[in-house]
A protein has these predicted regions:
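Extended, well-ordered alpha-helical segments in internal regulatory regions
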Residues: 160-178
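Extended alpha-helical scaffold segments
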Residues: 113-134, 160
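Acidic, contiguous internal or C-terminal segments within carbohydrate-active enzymes
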Residues: 127-136, 146-158
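Acidic, Ser/Thr/Gly/Pro-rich intrinsically disordered interaction regions
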Residues: 1-114, 140-154, 172-330
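Generic structural signal for bulky hydrophobic/aromatic residues embedded
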Residues: 119, 162, 169, 224-227
């Protein structure tokens, strides 16, 4: 008589257990030992019971474990321009790199970018709350109340650390495309690209914009983390003209220079720049290393706006039709 079938050998189904997310599943990808399920609103990590208990010693384990990773789904620009864009571009059919490793690093980079945005939002909320409180309070004597956004040094340090972690992951991805970059920095990448492709190459033009900010991130982090001179962070401060200045940061260290700037603006601008940089480097590095595909004239191009919501990305492999419209393939 045949042995009874183990419960884990049977088919089944499950629903995402998040009452705050009733949106449909839009994407699924297998990465490492996990399945990632992405709805319009959130991203989840799923693993099977055999991954938790491979020897099947506990028959009472539920067949599936699910965990919400982010409140970032296919409606999120952060996720679309990082993880979704990497999924479309970092493909074995088109590239000779370690695509699985590139995807793992992209996910790790997204974790840092999501945390960085939380720091941005937290600081912006603290700053605005302090401003609102000041505007709502009337002066009772001849003194002037100066608001506070909290420990601005700590906020800036946390932001710089998360930003630098993201930049480090991005450099690891770069080294999958350019093995000779191992142990080298952004200046080295820029010099290599100019020597190989020429100053006017679009990839070099992207690096001309990106590298100064990537170095600013590292230098700001070094100063704040190691208490080095070169970064000045100020909370709300009274000015000689009687006004109250908002929290600011200025940088002058190792060639990186930033004039006194509102901290909330600095954070939002750097966060946007990092997202732009990831997307553009992914596009240009993939284009530079694209392999021939079945004898067809494939290239990377902009996904038409009317189908971007279906693709969840702005760039893809494809071809131009006779009318000059880019047709994404894959």
């Amino acid at each position: 008589m045949a042995a009874p079938r183990h419960s884990r050998d049977s088919g089944g189904s499950f629903t995402l257990n998040n009452p705050d997310d009733g949106t449909p599943i839009k994407e699924m990808l297998s990465l490492g030992k996990y399945l990632y399920v992405i709805t319009e609103k959130c991203s989840y990590r799923v693993q099977m019971a055999d991954q938790v208990d491979p020897e099947r010693k506990n028959s009472a384990l539920p067949p599936v474990f699910q965990q919400k990773l982010f409140e970032l789904g296919t409606d999120s620009e952060l996720l679309r321009r990082t993880l979704m864009q990497a999924r479309v571009l970092f493909r074995k059919e088109f590239l000779g790199i370690n695509s699985d490793k590139a995807m793992e690093l992209t996910l790790e980079a997204l974790v840092e970018l999501a945390a960085l945005h939380e720091v941005c939002e937290t600081f912006a909320s603290s700053e605005q709350a302090a401003i609102d409180k000041l505007e709502a309070s009337a002066s009772k004597d001849k003194s002037q109340t100066v608001p506070s956004a909290g420990n601005v040094q700590t906020h800036c340090k946390a932001f710089a650390q998360k930003a630098d972690h993201f930049v480090a992951k991005l450099m690891e991805i770069v080294r999958l495309f350019y093995l000779e970059q191992k142990g080298k920095n952004w200046d080295d990448l820029q010099a290599m690209a100019k020597g190989r492709y020429g100053d006017s190459d679009p990839f070099c033009e992207v690096l001309n914009i990106a590298v100064p900010v990537l170095k600013l991130v590292r230098n700001t982090r070094d100063c704040l983390e190691h208490h080095l001179p070169g970064v000045v962070v100020r909370d709300f401060e009274p000015e000689p003209d009687g006004s109250i200045s908002v929290p600011t940061i200025e940088v002058n260290f190792r060639g990186s220079s930033l004039e006194r700037t509102r901290i909330s603006s600095f954070m939002s601008q750097v966060a946007k720049h990092l997202l732009d940089t990831f997307e553009m480097l992914a596009v240009h590095m993939s284009s530079k290393h694209m392999k021939p595909f079945a004898g067809m004239p494939m290239e990377i191009g902009p996904v038409p706006e009317d189908v971007q919501n279906a693709w969840h990305v702005r760039f893809a492999y494809g071809m131009y039709d006779q009318n000059g419209r880019f047709v994404p393939c894959g």
